[in-house]
Amino acid sequence: MDASAVVTAEMVRRIADGQARLFPGTEEILQQLKNAGYRLIFLSNCKTAYMKQHQATFGLDRYFEDFYCSEDYGYAPKYEIFIRIQKDYPGSYVIIGDRFHDLQIAEKHGLPAIACGYGYGREDEFCGANEIIKDIRELPEAIGRLL
């Protein structure tokens, strides 16, 4: 087993053992957005097993219509995978993320973007964002300002 597989297996085990946490307010905000009629699509650079364990542990299927993982697309850049998402789910988009990879989607496709300043990214990665939020509970209002 290569190092990446070992790390993934350990991360999946820890999530399954209850060692992972969502940011405070995440489930309430996701439910609020879903109830408001927004279609939520998940796109991540994470490994598929890691994503699936989060789905199972936190019941993310309750909120998201679909899940896309870069591993399933040969680790193509998110902005390329997004083309597939647009075909599968036509409509308007607001890109929400905590890393420059997320903001690249918005930049390359001419879409509004919200940077999550409470996530893993650094402030210098957020230069293309229309909005920067410091807490997920700010998300509904930020989306409202962009749509």
Residue locations for each model-derived region?
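Conserved phosphate-coupling serine/threonine residues in phosphotransfer and NTP-handling enzymes
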Residues: 44-46
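Alpha-helix N-cap and coil->helix boundary residues
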Residues: 2-6, 21-25, 59
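Generic surface-pattern signal
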Residues: 8-17, 87, 144
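Short, acidic loop-to-helix structural element flanking the phosphoryl-transfer center
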Residues: 13-42, 52, 79
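Asp-based, Mg2+/Mn2+-dependent phosphohydrolase catalytic module
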Residues: 48, 52-147
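Short, basic/glycine-rich phosphate-binding loops at helix/coil junctions
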Residues: 2-12, 62-65
